[in-house]
Amino acid sequence: MPPRDAVPTSTQVSGIGADGVQTEKVLKNRPKASALRQQKLPAWQPILTATTVIPTVFVIGAIFLPIGVFLFIASDAVSEFTVEYTNCLSPCQLQINLPNAFDGDVFLYYNLENYYQNHRRYVKSRNDQQYLGDLTNVKDCAPFDIDPATKKPIAPCGAIANSIFNDTFTLAHRADTGIVTMVPVTTQGVIWNVDKDRKFKNPPLNDGNLCDAFNNTTKPPNWSKNPCEVGGFENVDFIVWMRTAALPYFKKLWRIVDRTTNPLFSNGLPQGTYILTVENNYPVQSFGGKKEFVISTTSWAGGKNSFLGIAYLVVGSLAIVLGVVFIVIHMKFGHSMNELSNVSEIHH
Amino acid sequence: MPTEARDNNRHIHLGKVRDPHHQHAQRFCSNRISTCKYNGFSFLPRFLYEQFRRYNNIFFLAIALLQQIPDVSPTGRYTTAVPFLIILSVSALKEIFEDVKRRRSDNKVNAFSVEILVDGHWIEKQWKDVSVGDFIRIDNDSLFPADLLLLASSEQQGMAYIETSNLDGETNLKIKQALDITSTMTSPEKLSQFESEITCEPPSRHVNEFNGNIEINGVARHFGIDQLLLRGARLKNTAWIFGAVIYTGHDSKLLMNSKRAPLKSGTIDVQTNYRIIFLFFVLVALALISATGSEIWRGNNIPQAWYLSFLEHDPKGSFLWGVLTFFILYNNLIPISLQVTLEVVRFFQAIYINNDIEMYDVNSDSCAIARTSNLNEELGQVKFIMSDKTGTLTRNVMKFKRLSIGSRNYGNNEDDEFADASLIEDYRQGDEHSTSILEVLKMMAVCHTVVPENKDGQLIYQSSSPDEAALVRGAASQSVSFHTRQPQKVICNVFGEDETIEILDVIDFTSDRKRMSVIVRDGAGGDIKLYTKGADTVIFERLEHGKEQEEAVEYCTEHLEDYASFGYRTLCFSMRHLTEQEYSQWAPEYKKAILAIDNRAKLLADAAEKLERNMILVGATAIEDKLQEWVPETIQALMAADIRVWMLTGDKRETAINIAHSCALCHTNTELLIVDKTTYEETYQKLEQFVARAIELEKQEKGFAMVIDGKSLLHALTGEARKHFGDLALRCHAVVCCRMSPMQKAEVVEMVRKLAKHVVLAIGDGANDVAMIQAANVGVGISGEEGLQAASASDYAIPRFHFLRRLLLVHGAWNHDRSVKVILYSFYKNICLYIIELWFAMFSAWSGQTIFERWTIGMFNVIFTAWPPVVLGLFDHPVPAEQIMKYPALYASFQNRAFSIGNFSLWIGLAIVHSLSLFFLTYATMEHQVVWDNGLTGGWLMLGNCAYTFVVATVCFKALLECDSWTWPVVVACIGSIGLWIVFVIVYSLVFPHIGGIGADMAGMAAIMMSSYTFWLALLFIPLATLLWDLVIKSLFTIAMPTPRELAVMYNKRTTSFNGFERLASYSSNVLENMRLLTSSLRGSTTGSTRSRTASEASLALAEQTRYGFAFSQDESSAVAQTELIRNVDSTREKPTGR
């Protein structure tokens, strides 16, 4: 007499399993045995033992050191000359001696220090729609949106536009013979293509001139000239200024030396004496600011900044040192662990 | 009848008077049950209510609202609202999905079929269609769909056996009996003629109380709990019953008792909340500091800085506005996506659990089910397991295994059931020993309350005690087969010949007597014999004096010890020949005692005592309470994982201890600290004494376990004793609680939860475990055979007990490790990015200007770094599954990798260091601004976008570095996230001016940034240089002080030999401790048997302890007394079919 409380045995199940159709029906809840569901994807377990970390560190060192060297060489090849003119009375003339020739493209910058172009409310006070030609769109430009006197919209509106940098520079080369040659400069390549193509457009002219198009607007209070007289929104100096800087010590490209017009400068700026004439309009003394004029060449890595190259070299060397340290530790620990195990064996 | 107007009693019309169109005066609820959280209308309000109960959601809502104030938000108006909405909708999707699942499982229960009487015929309908007043028919082994009044059954006098283990956890069958006036209605014809009115109490939770009246033809009869069949119980050993439905659906006692599952939140969630609150205060502090900085800067620079002089009289320039601005700026320090990332991760972790083929049971075709997903990581923190016994550890299947007669020990442990041909061979010898064999087999076949039933030519034994049935079956398998019971006699087939044995008297089993006797007149010889079976202690002291019996006891004890070491339940059998005179003197006295009203129990016991003496020991039996598969292995593994295992059972102490031995909860040399006192003072003293003893045993490194019964527990949980009990409970690695009521189980769980902040897991299978499962941090239900009650109240349902090992060791340890990583990593990445705003504030006049573009800030958590934490949470395997299954000690070591304040601070510190490194390295690289050979400068976003790129790269590589196992999804997600940002930047750069004014700042920035070689070299350098220190520190720790996980992985990778493995381990004492556990569990699993020990050792250790459970699971106070039951049964009578 068989016990009636028998639990299902495996034979019953395998009996069902023999019948293919029924198996599917009966075992409908059986989970799929895919690697993903069963958490059985092929995996590599990174474990930072001496055997993995030592090669890693050495590889890092081996990659970093040459990159560091290249970067350092690149930065070293860049010539840069800076002259401060903050307190120079306008129109001021500064003599510059370039100790060596500045070969290739030569870029002329102005530097501003302690100038917070990245102040939140300042950055915000602009309207990119207006700069695309929609003159009446002055949203967000407060308090430089509508001129309180004329009730006309200010164009270009906003605090950034209002505070545009208005110093001008002329650079002249003085040969040993005493002949002074103006260094020809160009605005070609001073702004990013995107600014020219997508961000700054004058309003449609409608058969008139630019000033007709700007007719129903007022110039920003700080501006001395009407914007239409200096190229409207497509004014290069304006566009450069509107690309606000990230840090309170910033550099803006003013002009590039034109190497096509005068053969003297076809290879850049030759070594020698230069005279910089500055029309010093822009007030910075009140807030302790500083103004500089910069002449610089570039390398593939940009201007003169050896930081990244040195950093690569330092970290690369450190990695090599660490690798050595790891080897020492590894050997030392292996040794001490042997001893420890001997001790425990004695105790047993 | 009481008047209907006043009382709130339930009035039910039964039968013909119940017009289908005539409604009951009261409205009764339907039998459809629903455990859903939402319906179409309640979804939105309830969902929002649930969501905004969380602090962080309120926080982000506040931020989103604050951003609407003009000129205050540094990041625009919608940069919090949009990601927040995305995140809320992901949560909503998850909630809807889970509710649909609940609805499906409800529908399954609601759609169970049941037969309802309609127009004199049984019509098959669904459970949900059952309504109050219906007549229904339930067949054997079916569940009752509602609370029913038992009207009639297939058995004599309307008796029915039911199994209530789902309700109260008691394993023995209960006997219910229909009222005599209804028990005759055994056909649908009779039933459809039946009409009556029922008045009964309103629905209540009391399972053991019930009162009602049934009025038939104007005569009212009282009925009570003996006639009530509860929903959730199961009909057993009874072909069918007819019942009238009294309480349906949510009115039924089962559902009245089931609370709505409490919303459990894991310890990690609680800790995370604290961390978030901490960060909130950091945020407020930073906002205050920054606003102060802003004030100072303004004081020094405005109006001198003429380009900003328009801010001089700015109403939004005050300190408080500044605080608000910075509050919004830094709000992302609190990870907005953490909640949803965790939810998504847990959701998929739950899917892993549901899909684990190694937790799939072929027999029941069911898998593990994670019913809630927010406790996944809690499974990895379990310190206490509270396990139900019946149905969870044991199958509640009894098998007759061994037989001891004289010096011979029959049977073996290997076979499923008793199988020993030598028994019959010895019987055939025809000597004195063979008489003993015959007597034992006869006693097994006669001395019981089992009722045989012939069904389709097979004998089926019906019994309220599964042990007795096992013995009768055992005798039958040895050719002494009991097949007919009539009121005064039983007929057995003894070695091929029917033998009629007259039952003269039955002396019932009680828990005091611990024995049961029958007095029989042997059909063949006409001898009167007393057959007594019972616990060894009570039998041994009632034996004849003399050398012969002493010797028999000696043999028997030896055998019993052997049986006990395997956890078998044992019973001793003794007998005595009575003379006619002796019996006729005793019988009237006993009759008188039976009829006595006062002091009946004592009179009966006294009378029995007079007869039950000078007996001779004939043998002893061993019954195996079949364990579920792999129970001892599982328990050993769990204990090796440093989890304390408690067994909570309604059973008697002896039975409980027995099972504790067989399931490896304690071993033969484990000292049992038994608390069995009835008064508070005694319990207190005992506990105090045991605490001292436990400390002593701990010093001696000896195993010990506590055994406590329900009554003592009541005292132990009150007042001063509680402290001692808690102390003892924390010291014991194994605890057995016996004679527990379901509520007590829950109380114990709660008490242990309160003792220390440990995670308590409760596991059970029946409705009686529901309270405990709900009270525990994590509730696990066994869903195997029926899987309705416990499983549906549980957080995790598994088809087999032994899957608990995998659920905890693999899924628990993994998920905990993963979730902790997800949380810490989420904090890390947010702080790493957003604290950069603070560094930048120093360079931006404390104006609140962001260094990054506003939408890139908002999308950081939602897009660019959303995937690394998700893949960490889903694909990281800290240690291979096979390994942690093999070395459960690893589980304990993982608990130490917990979400501690130290660990949290480490990550936060790291985040700050990383952000400093990232910002200042970027600053130094970009300070000169000209990073192209075209000599141009990039402006504000050149710095911001570069820094952002480096942060994204660093954060994604950090995820890889933290990941313990690299699978392709991990690598793809981490590298892909960086790619995603690059793609985003390219696309975003192209937007302006095509879609409104969006993206003006970003216009062309991608081309500008990516045309710089310096940028690419910095991208290689800055993240690597930032992470190099992590790498170095991590490897130093791995080399010098490897964690057990690392050792295990190294071991697995065979980078070291096993010797080296141990040597490595011996380096740090902490690791050593873990290794001891690890290797001990290793050895434990290889040597396996701790049962091999000598008998003398065991008897020494267990001198005063009762170890052998005696096999009685008899229902003592049932509707029908044992004697009465026997006297009323005639197995030869034809049963009605009920059709």
Curated annotation (Swiss-Prot), chain A:
Q: Which InterPro entries match?
A: CDC50/LEM3_fam
Q: Which GO terms describe its cellular component?
A: early endosome membrane; endoplasmic reticulum; Golgi apparatus; plasma membrane; recycling endosome membrane
| Gene symbol of the encoding locus | chat-1
- Pfam families the record matches: CDC50 (PF03381)
Subcellular localization(s) per the UniProt record: Cell membrane; Early endosome membrane; Recycling endosome membrane; Endoplasmic reticulum
State what the entry records as the consequence of deleting this gene: RNAi-mediated knockdown results in the appearance of abnormal vacuoles in the intestines and defective recycling of endocytic cargo with the accumulation of cargo within abnormal early endosomes.
Q: How does it sit in the membrane?
A: Multi-pass membrane protein
Superkingdom of this entry's organism?
Answer: Eukaryota
Q: What protein name applies here?
A: CDC50 family protein chat-1
Outline what the protein does: Probable chaperone protein for the phospholipid-transporting ATPase tat-1. Regulates cell membrane structure and function. Plays a role in maintaining the membrane phosphatidylserine asymmetry and the formation of the tubular membrane structure. Involved in membrane trafficking and is specifically involved in the recycling and degradation of endocytic cargo and this is likely with the phospholipid-transporting ATPase tat-1.
Record key words, sorted: Cell membrane, Endoplasmic reticulum, Endosome, Membrane, Transmembrane, Transmembrane helix
Keyword Transmembrane assigned to the entry: answer is: yes
Residue intervals passing through the bilayer: 53-73, 309-329
Family per record? Belongs to the CDC50/LEM3 family.
Curated annotation (Swiss-Prot), chain B:
Can you tell me which residues form the catalytic site?
D388 (4-aspartylphosphate intermediate)
Keyword check for Transmembrane: yes
Reaction equations catalysed: ATP + H2O + phospholipidSide 1 = ADP + phosphate + phospholipidSide 2; a 1,2-diacyl-sn-glycero-3-phospho-L-serine(out) + ATP + H2O = a 1,2-diacyl-sn-glycero-3-phospho-L-serine(in) + ADP + phosphate + H(+)
Identify the GO cellular component terms for this protein. Answer: apical plasma membrane; basolateral plasma membrane; cytoplasm; early endosome; early endosome membrane; Golgi apparatus; late endosome; plasma membrane
The EC class name is translocase
Annotated keywords: ATP-binding, Cell membrane, Endosome, Magnesium, Membrane, Metal-binding, Nucleotide-binding, Translocase, Transmembrane, Transmembrane helix
Gene Ontology BP, a term: phospholipid transport
Report membrane topology: Multi-pass membrane protein
**Phenotypic effect of disruption:** Results in abnormal formation of intestinal vacuoles.
Q: Which GO molecular-function terms appear in the entry?
A: ATP binding; ATP hydrolysis activity; ATPase-coupled intramembrane lipid transporter activity; magnesium ion binding; phosphatidylserine floppase activity
Known EC number? 7.6.2.1
One protein family per Pfam: PhoLip_ATPase_C
Q: List membrane-spanning regions.
A: 78-98, 276-296, 318-338, 831-851, 855-875, 901-921, 935-955, 972-992, 1013-1033
Q: Where in the cell is it found?
A: Cell membrane; Early endosome membrane; Recycling endosome membrane
Family, similarity comment: Belongs to the cation transport ATPase (P-type) (TC 3.A.3) family. Type IV subfamily.
Q: What does this protein do?
A: Transports phosphatidylserine from the outer to the inner leaflet of the plasma membrane, thereby maintaining the enrichment of this phospholipid in the inner leaflet. Ectopic exposure of phosphatidylserine on the cell surface may result in removal of living cells by neighboring phagocytes. Regulation of the phosphatidylserine distribution in plasma membranes is likely to help in the maintenance and control of the membrane surface charge.
Q: What is this protein called?
A: Phospholipid-transporting ATPase tat-1
What organism does the record attribute this protein to? Caenorhabditis elegans
